[in-house]
Each structure stands twice: as C-alpha cells, then as structure tokens.
From Swiss-Prot:
Component of the ribosome-associated complex (RAC), a complex involved in folding or maintaining nascent polypeptides in a folding-competent state. In the RAC complex, binds to the nascent polypeptide chain, while DNAJC2 stimulates its ATPase activity. GO terms for cellular component: cytosol. InterPro entries: ATPase_NBD, Heat_shock_70_CS, HSP70_peptide-bd_sf, Hsp_70_fam, HSPA14_NBD. Keywords: ATP-binding, Chaperone, Cytoplasm, Nucleotide-binding. GO terms for molecular function: ATP binding; ATP-dependent protein folding chaperone. The lineage of its organism: Eukaryota, Metazoa, Chordata, Craniata, Vertebrata. Belongs to the heat shock protein 70 family. PROSITE patterns: HSP70_3 (PS01036). This is Heat shock 70 kDa protein 14. It comes from Pongo abelii.
Length: 509
C-alpha cells in the first residue's frame, strides 16, 4: 500500500507520494514537479496544466485559472465578487450557483468550479499513479487554515469525483511542520514556529506551538493582496514601460501583449532567485516589434520593495497580534514558490537573526510532502520514518448556533471559537416556545468578528412533529462534536420526548 498527498493552490498544484517509508514529490508527464492549476477548454478536449497555461494567449476566454478562489463560494461572497471581475473566463450565476461560461465555437456550456478542480485532481492522480500504480488512491488534501466549511466540502468533493479516497483534509501550516518533522526531533521540548507561506495569490502566516510533539495553531493571518502574481505583475508593468520607452507604444491596454509580458516576467522572476540577471526576449510583441530587455536582480528588488515591505509588516503585525516578539519564535518554515526570493529571505532573517530558516525542502513542495506523510500515518505504515505527529488541528473560524429567546428574537452563541484545539465536543441547550411543533438549529461560521451580519450559515438540524405545549418553553439539547479533520457531527434531542435528529458535515471521508 502507498499513500498520496495533494496540494491544490490558486496558481499551481503539486502531488507527493509516500512510498518505502519516505515521502517525495512526483514530476508530471512534462517533467515538472509543480503543475499549473489551469484548465483550458477547446472544441474536443479539456487541457490541464502547462499546455493549458501556454495556450491562454489565444484561448483566454475559455481558460480557467485560480479556481481555488471561487470553490464553495456564492455570488455574494466578497472574494468571489473580486474573482468574477478579474477572471478572463466569464463567470455567471445559474440557479444560485456560480458557473464558468465556456464558448468553444461549436457550443456554449456551463462548467461548475468543482468540475474544474476535479480535472486538476485527476491530473495529480495520474501523476501519482505513474510511480505507484493505479491501485493507490488514498490521499490527504491540504486546505488553507481560513477555509470555511463550504470551501472544504467543495475541495473534498472535487477530489472524490476524481477518484481519490480522501482520508483527511489537513491545514497547510500543519502539513509544513510535518514535512520537516518538527516536534519529532525534540519531542519533549516546547517551541513556537512561524509558517511563512507566500503562494501565487496570497500571503498566509501562522504561528504554531509545538509542545511534546503536539501541534497547535496560536494565530494566523492571510493577505489576499500579496502573492507571487503581484511580483510578476510588477515586473510585467516595468517591461511594458521599457517597451514604451524604446518603441513609443503603450501596450498596457492590449490584453494579448500584456499576457506575453506576464509570461516573460514570470520566467524572469523565477530565474532571478538564482541568477543575478535575466533576459526577457519577446518575438513580435506588438506591431511587429521584437522586445529584448535585461533585468537585474537589483532592479527587480527595487521594483518590488513595496511588496517586500508588506510581507515584513504582515509578520510584525502577526507577532503583535499574538503578543509575541521575534525572540519568542524558534524556527521559521518557508512555503510557497515566491518565498524562494533571496531578498525576501534576507528581510525575514533580519527580523529573526538567531532563528533557523527552514527551506531545505523546496518551498512549493513542503506542503504536499507533509500531506503525504500524514497519509502514510493514516494508512498505518509500520516503517514510516516519522512518528505519528499527535497533531492537534484547530478550528479555523468561529462556529456558532443561532437560537431564539422566549420573545422569539434571534440569539447567536459561539460554541467553537477560532483556534479551538480539535477534536472537541460542546453541548448547547436551545430553548424554543412550546407552542411550535418544529425547531430548527442553524449553524453559522464567521472569521471571528461575531456580529450576526458577518456570519455565514452552512448547515441546520430540524426537529419536526413535536407535541405542542400550552405554556412555557421546550428544551432542545444540541451536542456538537468536531473531529480533528474539521468534520462536524450534530445531534439535537427534545429533552421531554426524546425525539432526536442528527446530521454530519463531512470534510473528508
């Protein structure tokens, strides 16, 4: 038996496998260890990965990118609204669900985001099967710490639709620590770890406490306005200004030309992590003009200095939020492809001069490797080289119940505050007027602001056909159990009659 770990990011996906006591990333059929999370639709086929990304210049309206940003979200979600505006592939609402409108010329069809994610997961499964064989389908999927229940459900369903047997969803910072065996090297000590993840579209920071081999998230913060794409965009804008200076053409309003510049800027950005300069050459960029521009690392660092500053400010802000100083952090784990940037690493090192910066595992591989290790633990590998982590996941958001008081007014109660160590169990007594024959327990989640208009409903339990009472209230006992993977089981019982209803909100099978 073997196990698989998959990280589906906003801009790329990566798969690692556990085999023979070790976990490692598998290269795809193009020889790349990271696959663009891009799907392109044509008349006769669906293209996934690098080929889809390369074809976007001529097929941009039928090319889906960053699908993770819209998974499990509705049209009134602010992040979904931002995505809809920015997406080059048209997104519409149909029967209350968001859909991509794909027009291949032969037909127009609607595609749901989960199906796009399914195709990417299928590509990851195919890649894993190239080394494990087709019988290996057990997988652990990574999720951002701030994903809500609907987002986690959508991601899990997409993986299952691709043919995976989803063992568990694991939070990304927990997977990163597991990849480095943190907590296993010194199982009796206590330490605080900063997980710095600079992905394609966002910066995610987490401070984790490791105590006697147990992981716990202390604080976390995500900024969707800083990511690798923003560094690429900054460099592409510079290239556009250089082209204008040389040829008097402003191509910033030309989508095709800017897409070419973005592609060139992305390649240059990657090169500048290891080289002192990078050459950007584009054949016939605009009006038949070729473009050749050399960019030094120093120039790139100067252009991106505002982005670097935002990253450093975010670290300092999280330390303040946690009541920590830099001296309280024992290690820093780097994740996400853009954390490779040397200038950024130096700035982080300046904050934590005495702290070990962990980057020996490629930053865009560390999270799927941790997921594969977790999968290996779950399927019971006897020769796994890392002990069972005893990892404690935490609830990422507040979980609340909505009830009513004697007057019938709404009342919200927080049962699982964000950061609650999992597994956890809570009881809540809901009082409802005896004159009604049905009672509905509504479950909400929030990012911690705790005001009713900030809450998002994700489930409900309904007790029906209750005997009416002439006077007074009836007591409904709700028992909520949240497992380590974030799945929630809720039982509601009428204390007088014993009538009971239950639901499970699963995030992994």
């Amino acid at each position: 038996m073997a196990a698989i770990g998959v990280h589906l990011g906003c801009t790329s996906a990566c798969v690692a496998v556990y085999k023979d006591g070790r976990a490692g990333v598998v290269a795809n059929d193009a020889g790349d260890r990271v696959t663009p999370a891009v799907v392109a639709y044509s008349e006769n086929e669906e293209i996934v990965g690098l080929a889809a990304k390369q074809s976007r210049i001529r097929n941009i309206s039928n090319t889906v990118m960053k699908v993770k940003q819209i998974l499990g979200r509705s049209s009134n979600d602010p992040q979904a609204q931002k995505y809809i505006v920015e997406s080059k592939c048209l997104v519409i609402e149909k029967n209350g669900k968001l859909r991509y409108e794909i027009d291949t010329g032969e037909e127009t069809k609607l595609v749901n985001p989960e199906d796009v994610a399914r195709l990417i997961f299928s590509k990851m499964k195919e890649t894993a099967h190239s080394v494990l064989g087709s019988d290996a389908n057990d997988v652990v999927i990574t999720v951002p710490f701030d994903f809500g229940e609907k987002q986690k459900n959508a991601l899990g369903e997409a993986a299952r639709a691709a043919g995976f047997n989803v063992l568990r969803l694991i939070h990304e910072p927990s997977a990163a620590l597991l990849a480095y065996g943190i907590g296993q090297d010194s199982p009796t000590g206590k330490s605080n770890i900063l997980v710095f993840k600079l992905g394609g579209t966002s910066l995610s920071l987490s401070i984790m406490e490791v105590n006697s081999g147990i992981y716990r998230v202390l604080s976390t913060n995500t900024d969707d306005n800083i990511g690798g794409a923003h560094f690429t965009e900054t460099l592409a804008q510079y290239l556009a200004s250089e082209f204008q200076r040389s040829f008097k053409y402003d191509v910033r309003g030309n989508a095709r030309a800017m897409m070419k510049l973005m592609n060139s800027a992305e390649v240059a950005k990657h090169s500048l992590s290891t080289l002192g300069s990078a050459n950007c050459f584009l054949d016939s960029l605009y009006e038949g003009q070729d473009f050749d521009c050399n960019v030094s690392r120093a120039r790139f660092e100067l252009l991106c200095s505002p982005l670097f500053n935002k990253c450093i400010e975010a670290i300092r802000g999280l330390l303040d939020q946690s009541g920590f100083t830099a001296d309280d952090i024992n290690k820093v784990v780097l994740c996400g492809g853009s954390s490779r940037i040397p200038k950024l690493q130096q700035l982080i090192k300046d904050i934590f001069p005495a702290v070990e910066l962990l980057n020996s595992i490629p930053p865009d591989e560390v999270i799927p490797i941790g997921a594969a290790i977790e999968a290996g633990i779950l399927i019971g590998k006897e020769n796994l080289l890392v002990e069972d982590s005893l990892m404690i996941e935490c609830s990422a958001r507040d979980i609340l119940v909505k009830g009513v008081d004697e007057s019938g007014a709404s009342r919200f109660t927080v049962l699982f505050p964000s950061g609650t160590p999992l597994p956890a169990r809570r009881q809540h007594t809901l009082q409802a007027p005896g004159s009604i024959s049905s009672v509905c327990l509504e479950l909400y989640e929030s990012d911690g602001k705790n005001s009713a208009k900030e809450e998002t409903k994700f489930a409900q339990v309904v007790l029906q056909d209750l005997d009416k009472k002439e006077n007074g209230l009836r007591d409904i006992l709700a028992v909520l159990t949240m497992k380590r993977d974030g799945s929630l089981h809720v039982t509601c019982t009428d204390q007088e009659t014993g009538k009971c209803e239950a639901i499970s909100i699963e995030v992994a099978s």
